[in-house]
Amino acid sequence: MEPAAGFLSPRPFQRAAAAPAPPAGPGPPPSALRGPELEMLAGLPTSDPGRLITDPRSGRTYLKGRLLGKGGFARCYEATDTETGSAYAVKVIPQSRVAKPHQREKILNEIELHRDLQHRHIVRFSHHFEDADNIYIFLELCSRKSLAHIWKARHTLLEPEVRYYLRQILSGLKYLHQRGILHRDLKLGNFFITENMELKVGDFGLAARLEPPEQRKKTICGTPNYVAPEVLLRQGHGPEADVWSLGCVMYTLLCGSPPFETADLKETYRCIKQVHYTLPASLSLPARQLLAAILRASPRDRPSIDQILRHDFFTKGYTPDRLPISSCVTVPDLTPPNPARSLFAKVTKSLFGRKKKSKNHAQERDEVSGLVSGLMRTSVGHQDARPEAPAASGPAPVSLVETAPEDSSPRGTLASSGDGFEEGLTVATVVESALCALRNCIAFMPPAEQNPAPLAQPEPLVWVSKWVDYSNKFGFGYQLSSRRVAVLFNDGTHMALSANRKTVHYNPTSTKHFSFSVGAVPRALQPQLGILRYFASYMEQHLMKGGDLPSVEEVEVPAPPLLLQWVKTDQALLMLFSDGTVQVNFYGDHTKLILSGWEPLLVTFVARNRSACTYLASHLRQLGCSPDLRQRLRYALRLLRDRSPA
């Protein structure tokens, strides 16, 4: 069969046809398809010629399979060599789409740049040819599609996962830059995932040779959400623009959307040029620092690839050697090789099922008894672990007002997915809002001997009715007035059990949420579920509800607040929640102060006799309040002031 007119050029075509057969792709080896399967493929030309691709020069045929993806110029299909059974991804470009010289030059440029690249994290170029209808580029098949597919299924990835993928992208990108090639279109859809969960950089349709600064291309190209400001300003495209795009990729994987994405393209471009974006508080400090370093307006200010790899985000964070296939659709179990975590798992195994066979029943009972005793010792001293004693008479201790809180370092914080992270903006926002409201209330409050009239029918309030501090081993457990039980674990994760005890809610960070039926909790989370259940049982059996506020049915609270941070002083417990609620429990007389609502601010006071009243903060500001309540408001203000970063 004679070649069709209009082949790309003699040189690239001859190189593809020089060998008697194209190299085997990464798909099934020749032995993968045998006997009847190969006979079936061999019989297809007469029965379904539209599904066959034939190389005009060699006569080799390929069975065109499922559609893998499509772009502006081409569609990509899975293709199988009918003789060897080798599988490829074939990029099919209609001749009608490259009729103009500059369009054809673009395809030729892609082939010239890609064909000689050989790197573990670059999609392998196999061969190419064309016929009268199409141009065919045969590439390494990445059976798990692209990072875009994973992102669409998961929305956000854990930081160890992001490190895993970014290391491979950086490795491939460094190779390209060392060979003087700019990718110019780094985005999730151009990072392909193999059967073994290895990442490959692909799609070199916009790639270009690196030129001296004065000769660099000034055209605007790339995907809008990932384009660097210097490209939009037509200042030329250098390696730094690829680094910028990498920063946008990192942000998208961690946060769920690109940093500069808006509903309007012009507004997106304006944000990019002005580098206007926000860093969520849920990110770890190293992640925020690295993103801030990469997403800088001036290309000269951005870190190099080597500097990125030396950043704390990579050097101090855990990176798995390999990700499970299940991570394409669901959050994986990523347990770093940490001796403390191993000990934690060992302890929880011994306490909650999977007991060692060598232990007799008496030993097992002793272990559980020891846990109960430990819980009692750590909580009873400052907690309602027994029937309440008669309330003491007289005003609250003067020390509540005049003595600075002691031992008030944060004891637990809902953090990002790792250790050693700085306090997030979410906690800071709650603290600053409460500080501002309390200062405004107390500063103008007139003297008074009694409280104003409380609200007759306040909105139902979700508050902490019971709590257990077992942070010396596991974390801080609490029960809400809705009967939902939760634990803020020492590693910064949060798990809750619904009021009907049928649903488990897991938050690896304050912004990432997963829910499971009790019977479908992943195995990796079973130890935490065991601890949560034990806390629930303990609080149910040993602790009294801390006040007479009306109960709230959980069905009426679709998004119960998460405990962000808890702090213990020598006189009180401070709890900060994701909905802005602030609760202070005073040990000595079991009074409680709850700030909630914010628009308007509500102040709920649970007195010594367990009665609860809710007031508008504006009424307290205008009319004053009793000395008891005023002293507790001032102490709460002092606690919050110590939490404020200002």
UniProtKB/Swiss-Prot annotation:
PROSITE patterns, sorted: POLO_BOX, PROTEIN_KINASE_ATP, PROTEIN_KINASE_DOM, PROTEIN_KINASE_ST
CC per GO annotation: centrosome; cytoplasm; dendrite; Golgi stack; kinetochore; neuronal cell body; nucleolus; nucleoplasm
Pro residues composition-biased segments: 20-31
Effect of residue 219 to E: Kinase-defective mutant
Keywords: Apoptosis, ATP-binding, Cell cycle, Cytoplasm, Cytoskeleton, DNA damage, Golgi apparatus, Kinase, Nucleotide-binding, Nucleus, Phosphoprotein, Repeat, Serine/threonine-protein kinase, Transferase
Alphabetized InterPro entries for the sequence: Kinase-like_dom_sf, PLK3_STKc, POLO_box_1, POLO_box_2, POLO_box_dom, POLO_box_dom_sf, Prot_kinase_dom, Protein_kinase_ATP_BS
All copies of domain POLO box, residue ranges: 463-541, 562-645
Catalytic activity: L-seryl-[protein] + ATP = O-phospho-L-seryl-[protein] + ADP + H(+); L-threonyl-[protein] + ATP = O-phospho-L-threonyl-[protein] + ADP + H(+)
Domain Protein kinase: 62-314
Tissue expression as described in the entry: Transcripts are highly detected in placenta, lung, followed by skeletal muscle, heart, pancreas, ovaries and kidney and weakly detected in liver and brain. May have a short half-live. In cells of hematopoietic origin, strongly and exclusively detected in terminally differentiated macrophages. Transcript expression appears to be down-regulated in primary lung tumor.
UniProt-annotated stretches for the region Disordered: 1-35, 381-417
Biased composition (Low complexity): 10-19
Induction (record text): Cytokine and cellular adhesion trigger induction. Down-regulated in a majority of lung carcinoma samples.
Post-translational modification: Phosphorylated in an ATM-dependent manner following DNA damage. Phosphorylated as cells enter mitosis and dephosphorylated as cells exit mitosis.
MF GO annotations: ATP binding; p53 binding; protein serine kinase activity; protein serine/threonine kinase activity
Sequence positions that bind ATP: 68-76, 91
CDD domains attached to this UniProt entry: POLO_box_1, POLO_box_2, STKc_PLK3
Known partners and oligomeric status: Interacts (via the POLO-box domain) with CIB1; leading to inhibit PLK3 kinase activity. Interacts with GOLGB1.
Recorded family membership: Belongs to the protein kinase superfamily. Ser/Thr protein kinase family. CDC5/Polo subfamily.
Domain notes: The POLO box domains act as phosphopeptide-binding module that recognizes and binds serine-[phosphothreonine/phosphoserine]-(proline/X) motifs. PLK3 recognizes and binds docking proteins that are already phosphorylated on these motifs, and then phosphorylates them. The POLO box domains mediate localization to the centrosome.
Its biological purpose: Serine/threonine-protein kinase involved in cell cycle regulation, response to stress and Golgi disassembly. Polo-like kinases act by binding and phosphorylating proteins that are already phosphorylated on a specific motif recognized by the POLO box domains. Phosphorylates ATF2, BCL2L1, CDC25A, CDC25C, CHEK2, HIF1A, JUN, p53/TP53, p73/TP73, PTEN, TOP2A and VRK1. Involved in cell cycle regulation: required for entry into S phase and cytokinesis. Phosphorylates BCL2L1, leading to regulate the G2 checkpoint and progression to cytokinesis during mitosis.
UniProt-recorded name of the protein: Serine/threonine-protein kinase PLK3
Organism this protein belongs to: Homo sapiens
